[in-house]
Amino acid sequence: MPLYFITFLGTLAVALLLYLAAVSYAAVTRRPPPAFIPEAGMAWLQAAGLALLWFIVGVCWLAFFNVYQIHVDMSAIGDAAFHAFSRGYTRRLPIVVLPYAAACLAWTLALWGASTRIPRRAVWGIATLCVISILSTPWAALALDDMQDHGYTEAAYRQLQTSHLVRSLALTIAAVWALVEKWRLPWR
């Protein structure tokens, strides 16, 4: 397994653990998690999270409407073309998966920071949407793996598109929400 993929999985695991810990803390104490990240750090973290979210939203919709459609085209040409495309796609994944993992980590980490430009309730919503996107990821990965191992099938393609649509919608809503909250509040 390539190092970038181990990094990707590890980052998603940390994001999920941070989210679960925040949910558990809030459920038990009926208070938000303690703010370990000061306001100045949170301003930078939220800005980075917002930028990463919008980058990933663009990538998600490009993949949904363009890149994944190429699987259908390549399968029509033949198995050799399809597998060559799949291998090339997999080799180029770091540019997609590492910023995605960083965005999810930024927003789940923001649950543990002081409230700044984006209110705590919005941070919870954005982090939850990031977690929903993480939970949809295995189905897309399994569909891609199935197509790489056994070639293109309509069922695997539908699974890929459906799970990717869930991820794309969740991240788009999160990005719009973060942007609206960032603009809504007066600048300090």
Language-model segments: which ranges?
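Membrane-helix exit/interface motif
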Residues: A63-I70, A101-R117, P138-A143
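Hydrophobic core of alpha-helical transmembrane segments in multi-pass integral membrane proteins
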Residues: G10-Y25, V57, A101-W112, I126-I134
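Core segments of transmembrane alpha-helices
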Residues: V96-L111, R167-V176
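Interfacial segments of alpha-helical transmembrane regions
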Residues: I37-W54, A106-V131
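Hydrophobic alpha-helical transmembrane segments of integral membrane proteins
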Residues: G125-Q148
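Interfacial loop at the N-terminal end of multi-pass membrane proteins
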Residues: P2-I6, G10, L17-P99, Q148-R158
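Alpha-helical transmembrane segments of multi-pass integral membrane proteins
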Residues: Q148-W183
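Juxtamembrane boundary at the C-terminal end of a transmembrane helix
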Residues: R184-R188
